């Protein structure tokens, strides 16, 4: 009867759970981290190290966090934690953007607009309370993601100190000569009732009317003369324009041509029986005339646009208004007619060219911009014939204007087209350019544009195309409109002269005095402040500005209001946000940083893509393809979410679906099972007593430490360049190939069958200990909860948190002058694969049931055979086969052959050996197992 030898084996044993059960375990860990003050402990432990500052871009304090928030915060957390492990002190101060329209809208829905139920001060207080509640909700979910930071002391743009620092920052911008005021066309949202910054605009398709409108010549003969022709009697001349915004025609003050463009004078459609010639860009004449129903292009003359400069036209429906032909660089012959109707109140290029020609001084503000903040024509807007425009909304006016012009002879063509059009990012509604008095940060008057473009070149951009993207945006952007006509925000805090409109000559000094008061009482102080307190006898000559600052200025000055205020270095080491922030926070921060200090506020800038489903579609409620981070954490755990984020190529769109989550859960199990196997085989191992020195290790153990060292070099370099997908892939490959398919499989025999304290067994345990110590650190930035759990189960002293440690220093490469080098091991592993290929068909045809039932013969050249023959007694352990014989042969190739063994099987180690039964005390054991149980035990040198 077979004796039971199980008690003589050293099988794996660990209390580290096989199942992660993350949704239950993670909250308990969070409670402990909170209770123990983990972030403060980690900072204290890192005191005195070099600083690495990842500055948090503030999410808006409104609504629950979504998957994009989770991606952003987890990427930041991975970097921060990897920096602690790399030997840095990496403070992370989370922040929130708290002012602005979405919060105002939320309060308006509940209490109405200012003045209905609440006065302005009460309204601001409700906004403050609402934002604070939203911060608490978001903070809870951010913590649940496993993100560590100064959650008890975040920065909030609504804090009195921040608001005061923002006013101080604006004063610095003004001191450096960047502030200007003017009546300029700005992006205007009629729903917001306020100007918008570039970053508050998004583009969407819109169906717009298109019209070709003829502007009749005041002196047709003069225009004909510019083309070198004489006009036949009774022939009219007109210049047609093409536009998608008929509502701007009441504000039309000029028609722009391209100075160097070629124009032709062509026969157009008759005007109520009278012949009419048209001035059209030569490249567009055929297309334009086709729109007007004219088949043949009959050309009467050619001229450059410059030849027509300042000749006069008549407005198409305000006959008394002279419309000069002017020259503008913005005119092209790509589409339309080559002539651009110019309304300086409704377009930046129109404004600039009109200013050059002195047109703005000839007209009233109401003529330049005849619409109010709601998008309605002013009462002073003249009618179009019998059609009243005053009080009409511009989006309704398009059709009204077209209908009114149909029988006048000036409407040459009308149609519709779908095109990309600017919309408000909050309301998703079309916006318009509208000339209003605003405060701007000028891109030119103190060289801000040029300085910003230089600063961009000093920054390391991830991905690299980010540099060209933001440079293009800076190069083409208009002045930054920083004023808003709203209630909830930081006041511009300027006093302006009642007659001249000029800021007080001591403006920045006064602003700093206001900031001192705001720091104590918040922004309400500005509205209750008696100007005489600061201005004395001058108070009667000055008004307080009631405009507030653009929220992008709020977040744009965090480098000053947070970093400098908290004693952190500036520029920050890294800004990290979504790819839309090239036109948002990256840009506003860059402009304020350069305006204040002439340097970019960041050394590195990293962007990530947006989340989409497995088909590449944007996640939305309407499609039903959204996946909320809260649901992932509730069902799978935060570590699965973190693993997906780390493994995705975040430089592009990031796909997520239930199937992708399942694959990540499977990958997580592979990592966890590897850790559990390592821990199981470290049972009874104390590194203080049992650690075998690297030079004394069995060859294969020394090799796996060498491989771990190579992997750590790769992983730490990848963390340093933020390539987390490479890290995850390398870890999974190491677990599957180096450990799972090779090392752990081969060493089972030693670990299970050798005497507990045998050097060969302790050597394997030592190698596994080194791997486990390194492994827990490798995964810690990504799998924060699992790493914390694993840390507690490692042998030896492991107090505190894995983030108290740095990258493991117990690994080392194999010496190049060793008797057998890593290259020799690689050749033996290639031989192992060759053996496996030979055994595969033998298993398939039933010649053997397992590799242990096959005896192997390896034939190699004399030099190789001589190198391998000393190992031949142990090669069976590497191959997990029967006995191995190495022979020399006259060949350059290596040949492997195998045959079924006829030797008996040892019931303890399962090896087939001739020595089975040689000891009468253990008739079913091989001599090796008898020695391991009763005697001195076997010796292992190689495998």
Swiss-Prot record:
Q: Which InterPro entries match?
A: aa-tRNA-synth_I_CS, aa-tRNA-synth_Ia, Anticodon_Ile_BEm, Ile-tRNA-ligase, Ile-tRNA-ligase_type1, Ile-tRNA_ligase, M/V/L/I-tRNA-synth_anticd-bd, Rossmann-like_a/b/a_fold
Q: Please list the residues that bind Zn(2+).
A: 906, 909, 926, 929
Q: Where in the cell is it found?
A: Cytoplasm
What Pfam families does the entry give? Anticodon_1, tRNA-synt_1, zf-FPG_IleRS
- Residues annotated as binding L-isoleucyl-5'-AMP are 577
Q: Which cofactor does it need?
A: Zn(2+)
One biological process term in Gene Ontology: isoleucyl-tRNA aminoacylation
Q: How is the cofactor bound?
A: Binds 1 zinc ion per subunit.
Alphabetic keyword roster:
Aminoacyl-tRNA synthetase, ATP-binding, Cytoplasm, Ligase, Metal-binding, Nucleotide-binding, Protein biosynthesis, Zinc
Reaction catalysed by this enzyme: tRNA(Ile) + L-isoleucine + ATP = L-isoleucyl-tRNA(Ile) + AMP + diphosphate
In terms of one coarse class, where is the protein primarily found? Answer: cytoplasm
Q: What class of enzyme is it?
A: ligase
Q: Which domain of life is it from?
A: Bacteria
- Describe its function: Catalyzes the attachment of isoleucine to tRNA(Ile). As IleRS can inadvertently accommodate and process structurally similar amino acids such as valine, to avoid such errors it has two additional distinct tRNA(Ile)-dependent editing activities. One activity is designated as 'pretransfer' editing and involves the hydrolysis of activated Val-AMP. The other activity is designated 'posttransfer' editing and involves deacylation of mischarged Val-tRNA(Ile).
Print the domain comment field: IleRS has two distinct active sites: one for aminoacylation and one for editing. The misactivated valine is translocated from the active site to the editing site, which sterically excludes the correctly activated isoleucine. The single editing site contains two valyl binding pockets, one specific for each substrate (Val-AMP or Val-tRNA(Ile)).
Q: Which family does it belong to?
A: Belongs to the class-I aminoacyl-tRNA synthetase family. IleS type 1 subfamily.
Protein name as catalogued:
Isoleucine--tRNA ligase
Organism of provenance: Xanthomonas campestris pv. campestris (strain ATCC 33913 / DSM 3586 / NCPPB 528 / LMG 568 / P 25)
Q: Gene for this protein? A: ileS
